[in-house]
Amino acid sequence: MLFRSEKELLESWNEVNLYSMTRGINRFKGLVKALTEVQEKYQPVEGLETLVKWVEESDELSNPALEKAVEETGNICLKKALAWSQAVNASIKELPKEEVKPFEGVKEGIEMLHESCDIAIVSSANYEAVKEEWTRFGLIDHVDVVLAQNAGSKKSCIEKLLTYGYDKNKVMMTGDAPGDMDAADKNGVFFYPILVKKEKESWANIGEAKDRLQAGTFAGEYQDALKEKFVKNLTK
């Protein structure tokens, strides 16, 4: 029974985090979904309601913010969530370097974009992990600013970038998760999707997106078609 439960939970975890419209969800939001499923199907999770409340109300879902909440409450579920998150970061660092690499076409695409565009990383991942990976693969030289988990939500990060005077009609958010599209929509900027399991194709076509962005032909039919294809890819 335990083996079956673990298998079902892992499949559910992968569905939530990788292969559905919740792809790219913040790790703590994903954890709440998983633990809620455990509580509903298998056994009670001590202190879960406090973790749920923190995830729903915290302005920043990160390890430092969680550390502060642990100090303030001493809640067992918050403590375990922090230990888990720290273990995730440690595991990421221990991954064999050959297993962590950009998809084919990423470097060429970013280099091409940076010839005529400013590039900002807007990520919900850990800052140190993002910086290390982009540096290791020679991508950081083509980036103008790094905004990661500690900088706030993707929506707020784009909002901050727009205060530097960028024309919304010349801004494109590129990403593989619904949260990326949502952040773009809420800021009134365009969205170019990287399709899961079709990453090579997506990066090969990003040049057309750049050309349309600069020519003012991104809006309308082209943008609508990109979004439709993106949603279908995660809901089929």
Language-model segments: residues:
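Exposed alpha-helical structural elements
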Residues: E8, G30, T50, A65, ...
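C-terminal cap/substrate-recognition subdomain and adjoining C-terminal extension
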Residues: E98-D118, N126-K236
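Generic hydrophobic, helix-prone segments enriched in Leu/Val/Ile
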Residues: L9-N17, V70, A81-S91, S156-I158, ...
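Conserved phosphoryl-transfer catalytic core
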Residues: M1-L61, A65-L66, G207-A209
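Residues that form generic nucleotide/phosphate-binding pockets
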Residues: A34, W54, A69, A87, ...
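Conserved phosphate-coupling serine/threonine residues in phosphotransfer and NTP-handling enzymes
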Residues: S123
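Metal-dependent phosphoesterase signature
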Residues: Y42-E104
